[in-house]
Amino acid sequence: MGNVAIVFVTLMFSFFPLYLSDRYYYIRHDKLYAFYVLASLLVIAMGNVFLIHYNKKDKENKIENKKNKFSFTDYGIIGFFISAIISTLISDYKFDSLTGALGRNNGLILIFAYFVIYFIISRTYRENKVVPIVMAVTSSIVAFIGILQQFYWDPLNLYNGMSSSQYTKFISTIGNRNIFSAYLTIVMPLCMVLFILSKKYYQKIIYGISAVITFGGIVCCNSDGSILGTIGLFLFCYIFFIRNLKDFSNLLIITSLMLIVCKVIRYFSYIMDDYSMGFSAIESTLVYGNTYVVIGITLVLGIFLNIFSEEKGITKTPKVITLSLIFLTILLFALGVFAFCYFTFIDTKTSLTGAMKYFRFNDSWGTHRGFMWIRGIYIFLNVNIIQKLFGTGCDTFGQIMTDMGYNDELMAFKNETTNAAHNIYLNYLVTVGIFGALSYITFVVSSVIRGIKRSMRNKYCIVLVASVISYSIQGIVNIDQPITTPLFIVIVALLENQNRIKA
């Protein structure tokens, strides 16, 4: 059974991100149907293997058997699936809730597919050294295509037949830029942490190159979600890896290399006479800003600590450094919260520019995500008690926005409408209710907590934890859909698989 799961996971991280049939015209449905086919083949193959070997004991199986209790992560996805069923049954748009046709196809059928593959992968997958390398190589290809397209180089001719005004909306073999950013927040953390933990030089080279290229893709995709997820990732990694001097030195080195690739992009832009699709505020600072001092400090300090830890045999970082970094992180977070509250509730008149705009929440915040979030809360407050508990129907947020007149308001405000909240958690709060949203959060948070605990005995668990954290944070400003969510479910399933291994 383990071999079947390995093949499925390998295809999900190689074939799936690269597959598209007709450029960007049907890309969401291409990925949707590809996932359905792969999931169906997994179920069929697993069923055949079970029928053949059901009476044979797998002596190599170290995974807890079915007599063991479900984990909190299991209960989370079970509750989420149950809420999706109830939501569909009580919805005014039952068929659309089933298919997700009113939104991004994240309907009950797709949620059922998530549910099935999660339990298959979490129970049958066996660790394989080839899978992460395949993931790293594929993600590098996907990200590199995106970097080239940022400068109007289109190696796969994906923009053929599109107007130039649409170029800025789509990128690489993933599609929409926000979805591309979500993909990168899954794979970049995997490559980055694998670089930190790998002992063999060839693995460090592969994962290091992949981490750098995928970070370059994040810089070029111009999406708030990927920047938010990356900030959360780095905060987590610096706090987690500070305890081990060797790991911390590797983190400093990969940080410097990621900053260096921003300068490589800068010089490439110079060669191209700055003929690009442009960079947002934070990305522009990374590319064009004077970050050479930071690069030098992180690189030199990382190399010094790496050599020092090997020569002196010191593995633990001095406690004063650990506590100082944690204190600095808390201080910066507190200052950020203070600035956000001050410019949102007290000083609402001062003009804010660049990245400072994120510290004032209003209808225009985050490409008018503020408008959608505020109306999303209004929707939740106005539906009946049953809908508060179980939602209005899977992926029906946009239709409810229309029914309550909020899409008309959005059209008057920004000359467009929306079919999603652009916040995974708020979207689920409306569509599958309190029960579904809390179940989903339980599914994610419990996997992270258990993964961190498990990493004390198996450091490689933190590779998957980093990916889950990064994607979950970017989800605050993004949406679930059939392009990246299946990959995220696979990551959580792999983490659950590791969490269930007996000590």
Which residues are covered by each model-predicted region?
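Interfacial juxtamembrane loops and adjacent helix segments
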Residues: Q149-I174, K349-T367, I374, V383-V430
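Non-cytosolic membrane-interface motifs at loop->transmembrane helix junctions
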Residues: K31, L98-G107
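Membrane-interfacial loop-to-helix junctions in multi-pass inner-membrane proteins
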Residues: E64-D74, R126-A136
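Transmembrane alpha-helix boundary signature
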Residues: G47-K67, S87-T99, D154
